[in-house]
Amino acid sequence: MLQRDYIQRLIREFMAALERMLEKKEVEVRREKIRELYNQYVGPYAFYSIATIEDVMKAMAGIADEEKRLSKMDMLAELYYHEADTVGQPTRDELLTTAFMLFDYVDAHGDTFSIERRNKMAEIKQKVGDALK
């Protein structure tokens, strides 16, 4: 029970920090805040900024607690999703594709339904198109 409360509190803190980052207008400031969020909530930005989906899944497999693993994957997907708005092509599509795959995994394996997650997945499909097939 304490583990679940901790994870939920961590997610709330992360979402609040993400909202504060989104209020920043300047792209460089947003990028720096995103880097800070990676390092604070998910893991080293130096790794996740260049990791393939296979690398990410291997890293996440090291987290034994499934709820914690899915929460981190969801946070990472959010970071990829929002970071895509701060970069150009082809990096944008790569980030969106990775975000989609993580959202899809969390959606399939998690026990929490999220309409917001589904909406983001639909938006990514529109933006990226055939790359997801």
Give residue spans per PLM region.
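Short coil/turn connectors between adjacent alpha-helices in alpha-solenoid helical repeat scaffolds
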Residues: 22-33, 83-95
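N-terminal alpha-helical interaction modules that lie
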Residues: 1-73, 105, 127-133
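Non-transmembrane amphipathic alpha-helical segments
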Residues: 17, 77-80, 102-103
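Amphipathic alpha-helical binding modules
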Residues: 89-133
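Aromatic-enriched hydrophobic runs in primary sequence
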Residues: 6, 26, 36-41, 80-81, ...
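Mid-chain, well-packed structural core segment of small domains
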Residues: 68-92
